[in-house]
């Protein structure tokens, strides 16, 4: 048997749902999708859900992962085994841990490939900081997986599809975290997963102010701006949501233009699926040139304005 009898899908990030649904179609005969509102439910049915389970009644101060109890109860009531697919977001991983405990299921995070052999999930994901790919065969009846972005293609909606809708009512867990305050995060995040062209900056750009040069190039060619992990987490020059690498974004654009990025394996794991990689770095021995299809050795601060002017013609 090369499919599960059923799969359960949930995404706290609506933009990740189409990819998870496409994966679900390949892995199971019946697709169940947990959603938070009617709009997401309608989308899930168009993407292939046979049954939609609307999670309802959570107090505003409680967290999404507190639905884990009623989600696990629903899953158990409808089969003695099954596959659970979640995005590898922070909240997705929190929910995965709680579901794993309640279902007595193995949990595998950041899956980059999933298949079914003899009714059991086989999962591949990066290990040793991206230096190798590990393969796990999950032996428990239930398997809970968080999926890396780009693992599956995106499912296309079909308005003619139909499905059944159910309601799952909130039940307060015995132990829970209560939200006491919410502070809006200053962010200009974009959906980089869908970007066709990406300009990504590393610390070789020199300063936060110099990132404006990359932004001008983005405007000239219609690209989105990304960065390396040190730019986001060490220097705090850009938002966390924009960094590319094994522990965050895994991109597959048509063009990935790496500016001042050394090309360490942890970063390239998130970029080497790009159709074309173009590198700009003043160090001719930078590892990035081993991955690049095209490269320029030189100072990015001088090259970017000239490149922008040429491409804007």
From Swiss-Prot:
Binding residues annotated for FAD, in chain numbering: 255-283
GO molecular function, one term: flavin adenine dinucleotide binding
Family annotation (Pfam families): ETF, ETF_alpha
Keywords per UniProt: Electron transport, FAD, Flavoprotein, Transport
Pathways involved: Amine and polyamine metabolism; carnitine metabolism
One Gene Ontology term from the biological process aspect of the record: carnitine metabolic process
SUPFAM superfamilies: Adenine nucleotide alpha hydrolases-like, DHS-like NAD/FAD-binding domain
Record has Flavoprotein as a keyword: yes
PROSITE patterns: ETF_ALPHA
Similarity comment: family membership: Belongs to the ETF alpha-subunit/FixB family.
Subunit structure: Heterodimer of FixA and FixB.
PANTHER family hit by this protein: ELECTRON TRANSFER FLAVOPROTEIN ALPHA, PROTEIN FIXB-RELATED
Function noted in UniProt: Required for anaerobic carnitine reduction. May bring reductant to CaiA.
Protein name: Protein FixB
Lineage of producing organism: Bacteria, Pseudomonadati, Pseudomonadota, Gammaproteobacteria, Enterobacterales
Gene expressing this chain: fixB
